[in-house]
């Protein structure tokens, strides 16, 4: 691919914020997005922005008692577009951004900070009930149904006497029918655990040697296809989730991408083979996954095992001197993307020529 044909990553709008921003998410079916974080005075903040004529207009600012670490629209309907958030005190709240004074759902989900959140079953993505998963420093991963008060529908925690590991990232997947659904969780010691929610079992686990910062399936609402895991020390791994070997697990390929921590991975909603990683040195890398000629082969005993593909770098850009801590593609407009970084900036990016890859 020549330099002229390659996608370009263009910083379209930059906005400096007056607080530390931890997460940003597009509001579905709109040119709006939310940013979440904490003010220096120790309170939490949610801001709603809209893109208007090449600039950002602040539509709403909501201040809450506790700093807000993460949020998702993944379990809401397209009509309501409620935002679910996790905060520093372990609370899970669901907000109607039109009337945000009181949450529409509230539960003290964890004993410590909720580091990570994901949703499925809303927005027309994933079969089955809407659910939210949260992961916390208290070592537990909990699945919540917004229609059920107080208690999680599933609770994955270490057994008595086992060390509690800090859970840094969670992701839903495999939600291709009413029954099937998995949650993948990544921990500070490099553990990755795949929980099967249908029969409430640990389906697979592995360790990638470095703390797992971000996990994402290429699609939540299909039979598991690929999983990307990013980590400290600048590495990420792509697992082929189609074929699970009884002892070797899933085949994977790893890539040393950034000079420092890879904070985030996000797959392009319009093409699941393309994904963006965000690094600790303020850089973004755009990748494409290439499948092998055959995705599975038989081992010496005739048991099916997966074959990993390869990853190629399409483009990279440095936006900031500080880590890019969150990243979100627009579900509606191909190539439109937002990211936030620890220099208290939110950026709207345009990635060009994505239809040509």
From Swiss-Prot:
Cellular component aspect of the GO annotation: dynein axonemal particle; RPAP3/R2TP/prefoldin-like complex
Name this protein carries in UniProt: Dynein axonemal assembly factor 10
Pfam families assigned to the protein according to its UniProt record, in alphabetical order: WD40
InterPro entries linked to this entry: WD40/YVTN_repeat-like_dom_sf (IPR015943), WD40_repeat_dom_sf (IPR036322), WD40_rpt (IPR001680)
WD repeats: 63-105, 115-154, 162-205, 207-249, 257-297, 319-357
Domain of life from the UniProt record: Eukaryota
PROSITE patterns, per the entry: WD_REPEATS_2 (PS50082), WD_REPEATS_REGION (PS50294)
UniProt keyword terms in alphabetical order: Apoptosis, Cytoplasm, Repeat, WD repeat
Top-level taxonomy: Eukaryota, Metazoa, Chordata, Craniata, Vertebrata
């Amino acid at each position: 691919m020549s330099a002229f044909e390659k996608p370009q990553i263009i910083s379209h709008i930059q906005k400096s914020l007056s607080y530390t921003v931890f997460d940003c998410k597009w509001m579905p079916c709109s040119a709006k997005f939310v940013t979440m974080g904490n003010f220096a005075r120790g309170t939490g903040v949610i801001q709603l922005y809209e893109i208007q004529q090449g600039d950002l207009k602040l539509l709403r600012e909501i201040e809450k008692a506790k700093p807000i670490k993460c949020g998702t629209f993944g379990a809401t309907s397209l009509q309501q577009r409620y935002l679910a958030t996790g905060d520093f005190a372990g609370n899970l709240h669901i907000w109607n951004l039109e009337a945000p004074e009181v949450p529409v759902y509230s539960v003290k989900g964890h004993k410590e900070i909720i580091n990570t959140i994901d949703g499925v079953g809303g927005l027309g993505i994933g079969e089955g009930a809407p659910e939210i998963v949260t992961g916390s420093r208290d070592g537990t991963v909990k699945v919540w149904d917004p229609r059920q008060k107080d208690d999680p529908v599933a609770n994955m925690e270490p057994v008595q006497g086992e060390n509690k590991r800090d859970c840094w990232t969670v992701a839903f997947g495999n939600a291709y029918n009413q029954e099937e659904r998995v949650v993948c969780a990544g921990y500070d010691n490099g553990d990755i655990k795949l929980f099967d929610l249908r029969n409430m079992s640990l389906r697979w686990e592995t360790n990638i040697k470095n703390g797992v910062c971000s996990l994402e399936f290429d699609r939540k609402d299909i039979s598991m296809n690929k999983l990307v895991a990013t980590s400290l020390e600048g590495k990420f791994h792509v697992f082929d989730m189609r074929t699970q070997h009884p002892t070797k697990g899933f085949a994977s390929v790893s890539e040393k991408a950034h000079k420092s921590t890879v904070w985030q991975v996000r797959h392009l909603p319009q093409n699941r083979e393309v994904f963006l990683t965000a690094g600790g040195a303020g850089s973004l890398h755009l990748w494409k996954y290439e499948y092998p000629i055959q995705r599975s082969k038989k081992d010496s005993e005739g048991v099916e095992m997966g074959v990993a593909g390869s990853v190629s770098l399409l483009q990279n850009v440095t936006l900031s001197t500080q880590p890019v801590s969150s990243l979100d593609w627009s579900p509606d407009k191909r190539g439109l993307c937002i990211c936030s970084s620890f220099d208290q900036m939110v950026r709207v990016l345009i990635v060009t020529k994505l239809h040509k890859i």
